Amino acid sequence: MALNYLITGGAGFIGSNYVHRLLQRGANVTVYDNLSRAGAPRNLDWLKKDFGADSFNMQVADVRDAASIREAARQADVIVHLAGQVAVTTSVTDPRSDFEANAIGTFNTLEAARLSGHDPIFIYASTNKVYGGMDDVRVVEDATRWHYADLVNGCPETQPLDFHSPYGCSKGTGDQYVRDYARIYGLRSVVFRQSCIYGPRQFGIEDQGWLAWMTIAAVTGRRITIYGDGKQVRDVLHVDDLLDAYDAAIEKIDVAKGRVYNMGGGARNVLAVWAEFGPLLEKLLGRKIEVARAGWRPGDQRVFYADFGKARKELGWEPKIGLEDGIERLFRWVQENQALF
């Protein structure tokens, strides 16, 4: 029998890609989204074009509305909670809205799951920002990047949480509540502390989704500003690999419930945000890219890459799409869909 999925933020980048995958399988899907992001209507159009307007249930609503999310969750077998405020910079300028969307919105969604009486699986998209600046970890500067001096495989889940920036705090609140609902209420919940996720259907902007944003800006001739020294290192993970991890956790929920997993490309898929990504982008574009420079932004880690060994051991998961292959796929999608931007 087909499972009933509730995807909050289902019209967003990760959400729409997962909805597409689920509809291909014949799942029953409810997309729950407030459509506040510019790309959301375009992602819905894509889903309707591929599967038909009646292929999924659409609820235009906000997770800050406890009554609406409780109603949406009543029959859900799986809840994938992706909705929220996603930019560190926005959290600094408007911390109240950030807290309401991420902390209260996640609490409302957890309560909806708990009170449904349906024992749903609950997947939560957390963030590596919960680790904060990792000031106790030594980093080393090379010609094109910063890197960890001692964490050869990257940051493990045992790294102390430090919650820098209002965004890190609000997502961290959700992170800890999701874990505790597994302990206290037996909710079958899983936390994924996600690194930089990228891929098609990502309408990146300067404040969030840097890899997609720079690709879109380069292809469409928009100005790119590099903040900090451009050597900040991130591990990048293609969205298809992330969705494989969601699938693995759902399939192995007896193992995964109550667990936290770092979810990123790991040490083999790291990239300096401009010192290394810039030349790759220029090669794909076939020309030099002029950029502006500005100072460091709040909460911007010099280094982050995840040790995903726990997910590999417990879920049998690891990334399949290499960095250069994935970036080339994203570049081609942007080139072929310039009218969307």
Predicted regions and their residues:
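N-terminal Rossmann-like NAD(P)+-binding domain of SDR-like oxidoreductases, especially those catalyzing
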Residues: 1-197, 317, 329, 337
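C-terminal substrate-binding subdomain of Rossmann-fold SDR/epimerase-dehydratase oxidoreductases
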Residues: 18, 61, 196, 216-341
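Activation loop
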Residues: 40-43, 87, 207-210, 214, ...
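Short aromatic-enriched loop/helix-cap "lid" or pocket-rim segments at secondary-structure transitions
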Residues: 41-44, 133-138, 202-206, 273-276, ...
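Residue-level signal for the nucleotide or nucleotide-sugar donor/cofactor binding architecture
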Residues: 64, 93, 101-104, 158, ...
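Residue-level recognition of oxygen-bearing side chains
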Residues: 68, 78, 97, 104, ...
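A conserved pocket-lining segment of Rossmann-fold NAD(P)-dependent short-chain dehydrogenase/reductase
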Residues: 91, 150-165, 189-203, 213-237, ...
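Non-catalytic, surface-exposed connector residues within folded enzymatic/regulatory domains
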Residues: 92, 124-125, 191, 204-208, ...
